[in-house]
UniProtKB/Swiss-Prot annotation:
Any Pfam family matching the protein: PD40
UniProt-listed Gene3D superfamilies: TolB, C-terminal domain, TolB, N-terminal domain
Descriptive protein name: Tol-Pal system protein TolB
Entry-linked InterPro entries: 6-blade_b-propeller_TolB-like (IPR011042), PD40 (IPR011659), Tol-Pal_TolB (IPR014167), TolB_N (IPR007195)
NCBIfam families, per database record: propeller_TolB
Organism this protein belongs to: Nitrosococcus oceani (strain ATCC 19707 / BCRC 17464 / JCM 30415 / NCIMB 11848 / C-107)
Length: 434
C-alpha cells in the first residue's frame, strides 16, 4: 500500500498538511555531520596557512580541509598529527609526509594588504613525486575569503581527481519554524553548499514547495501558497524580481527547467486531472504533454532536452515513465518495488535518483537507465526530494529524524553519508545548484 503522506505531497493536493509539523524557531546555518564513508578516502595534509599582518576573518585552510573531507574522496590529516608546518617549498621534507601516509600536501599564506583586502597564496604538492601540482595567488576583499577557499578546494579536487569540484555551488531549501505566538513561518533559503552564508529568498505564512534552479543558476522556480492556493513563480536571485508563471485553477506545481532555460515543465490540473505541461517562458505558450486519466506529476527534464521523466500511477501504483518532449507514448522505466517516484537526472543523463518505496519504507535509490539496474543507497525510512550534485557524485535529499525534518547527502555508490540540520527548524525541499 502506498505511503499516503508522500503521495499526497507529490500530487500537491494536501501540501498544507505535509507542512503542519511544529518546531521551535531559531535561525541558524545548516550544520553538516559526516556520518559514514571516510574509510577509503585519500589522506591529504593541509597545513594551516601562515598569516602575515592582520588576522583574516576566515581560516582559509580549515575551509579547504572541511570541503575536501565532505567530498568523501579525501581524509585531511588532523592538525595535531602534522609533523611540521612548512611555509615554503624548500621547507618540505617529503619523506616525513610519506611516513604519515599522506598522498598530497597543501601549504599557503594569507597576507594582509590593508584596506580590508588580502592576498592568498597556495601550493599543492605530490608527496611521492616530490613535485608541485598546482599553485596560485589571489587578491580578494575580506568578505571574499571564504568563497576563495571554496574555489581553491575545487581546484585541488579537480587536480587530484580529474573531476569538477562542487564547493562553490549552492543549495536551495525550505525551512518551517514556529513563531512565539504559534504561527508557522516558511522560508525559501539559498546557502553555500557547506551551509554557510544562508539568505532568504522568500518568507511566507503559507507553504513553499519544489524549488528548482535555472540551468545558469541565476533563477529559482518554486511553488508558493501565499495567495491561499498553489502558484508557480520564477524569481531572479540577484534582484529579487519575480513573476507568476502558473496560477490556474486547481493544482500548479512541480516546476522543472528545460536544459536551455527557456521552458518549464509543470503539473497543472486546470482541465480537471493532474497532467504534465510545458510553458515557454518567452512567449507564454502552454503545451499539454500527457493525456491520461491517472495522476501524472513530478516532471524531470532530461539533460539532452529530448524527453521528460515523470511519476504516474497509471499502472495502479506510482512509477516512473519517460515521454518525448514532442509528445507521444510514455514508456515505463521502473518495475522493481511498489513505489518509485521523484526522479532527478544525473548531469550525464545516464542515471536517475529517485524515491524507492517497498514495505512501507522510502529510500534514495539510483536507476541506471541503460542496464535498468536499481541500487538502493540509504537506510533512512522516509526520504524525499533527491537532487544530484552538478558533478554527479553526491545526492542531496530530505529525510526525517527524531528532531524533525533534516537534509542528508549520500554518494552515488552509497559509501559516503552526511546529515545537514538547522537548529530549531524543519528543513525540506532541497535543490542543488548547477
Amino acid at each position: 500500500m502506498m505511503n499516503t503522506r508522500v503521495w499526497c505531497k507529490i500530487i500537491g493536493m494536501l501540501a498544507l498538511l505535509v507542512w503542519l509539523v511544529s518546531s521551535p524557531s531559531v535561525f541558524a546555518v545548516l550544520t553538516i555531520e559526516i556520518t559514514g564513508g571516510t574509510e577509503a578516502a585519500l589522506p591529504i595534509a593541509i597545513v594551516p596557512f601562515q598569516n602575515e599582518g592582520s588576522t583574516p576573518p576566515e581560516n582559509v585552510a580549515a575551509v579547504i580541509a572541511a570541503d575536501l573531507a565532505r567530498s568523501g574522496r579525501f581524509a585531511p590529516l588532523p592538525e595535531e598529527d602534522l609533523i611540521s608546518r612548512p611555509r615554503n617549498a624548500s621547507d618540505i621534507q617529503f619523506q616525513d609526509w610519506r611516513r604519515l601516509g599522506s598522498e598530497g600536501l597543501v601549504i599557503g599564506k594569507v597576507i594582509s594588504l590593508g584596506a580590508d583586502r588580502y592576498e592568498v597564496r597556495f601550493q599543492l604538492f605530490d608527496i611521492y613525486k616530490e613535485e608541485q601540482l598546482v599553485g596560485r595567488r589571489y587578491q580578494v576583499p575580506a568578505a571574499g575569503l571564504r568563497h576563495l577557499a571554496h574555489q581553491i578546494a575545487d581546484l585541488i579536487y579537480e587536480t587530484l581527481t580529474g573531476e569538477k569540484g562542487i564547493f562553490t555551488t549552492h543549495i536551495a531549501f525550505v525551512t518551517v519554524s514556529r513563531a512565539a505566538h504559534g504561527a508557522k513561518q516558511y522560508s525559501l533559503q539559498v546557502a553555500d553548499v557547506d551551509g554557510h552564508n544562508p539568505h532568504t529568498i522568500l518568507r511566507s505564512k503559507e507553504p513553499i514547495l519544489s524549488p528548482a534552479w535555472s540551468p545558469d543558476g541565476t533563477q529559482l522556480a518554486y511553488v508558493s501558497f501565499e495567495r491561499r492556493r498553489s502558484e508557480v513563480f520564477v524569481q531572479e536571485l540577484r534582484t529579487g524580481q519575480r513573476q507568476s508563471v502558473a496560477s490556474f485553477s486547481g493544482i500548479n506545481s512541480a516546476p522543472d527547467w528545460s536544459p536551455d532555460g527557456g521552458k518549464l515543465a509543470l503539473v497543472l490540473s486546470k482541465e480537471g486531472n493532474p497532467e504534465i505541461y510545458i510553458r515557454d517562458l518567452a512567449t507564454g505558450r502552454l503545451t499539454r504533454l500527457t493525456h491520461n486519466t491517472a495522476i501524472d506529476t513530478e516532471p524531470a527534464w532530461a539533460p539532452d532536452g529530448g524527453s521528460i521523466v515523470f511519476t504516474s500511477d497509471r499502472g495502479g501504483r506510482p512509477q516512473l515513465y519517460q515521454i518525448p518532449v514532442s509528445g507521444g507514448r510514455a514508456q515505463r522505466l521502473t518495475f522493481d518495488g511498489a513505489y518509485n517516484a521523484s526522479a532527478s537526472f544525473a548531469p550525464d543523463g545516464r542515471r536517475l535518483a529517485l524515491i524507492h518505496g517497498d514495505k512501507g519504507q522510502f529510500h534514495i535509490a539510483v536507476l541506471n537507465l541503460q542496464s535498468k539496474e536499481l541500487q538502493v543507497l540509504t537506510e533512512t525510512r522516509m526520504d524525499e526530494s533527491p537532487s544530484f550534485a552538478p558533478n554527479g557524485r553526491m545526492i542531496l535529499y530530505a529525510t526525517s529524524s527524531p528532531q524533525g525534518g533534516v537534509l542528508a547527502a549520500v554518494s552515488t555508490d552509497g559509501r559516503v553519508r552526511q546529515r545537514l540540520a538547522q537548529q530549531g527548524d524543519e528543513v525540506r525541499e532541497p535543490a542543488w545548484s548547477p
